[in-house]
Amino acid sequence: MIAVVFRYDVRDSETFEEAYGPVGEWAKFFRDGTGFIGTELLRDVEEPDRYIVIDRWESIDAYNVFISEHQKEYLERSDESRLFYLQELRFGTFENVWVD
């Protein structure tokens, strides 16, 4: 399992949560992908306009295939989504090394 992790500083929390949450437009888009597990949305308790988004996939290959096959739509959605945030930082793609 891998996790693709982003941090966002947002303009409007409610709008951002609707778009990026587990039932939001991004998660709906990813659900079409083989190997997509789900999205987790975390809000910073000390800075409530800061969020972490974690998209989980069965493998890096599943993620890369989806992005490759849907690159045009992914880029279009990314451009449209810029209205929701002030800053986006991609932390990286992480794999589980220990599961309890």
Report each predicted region and the residues it spans:
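Short amphipathic alpha-helical segments
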Residues: 13-38, 73-79
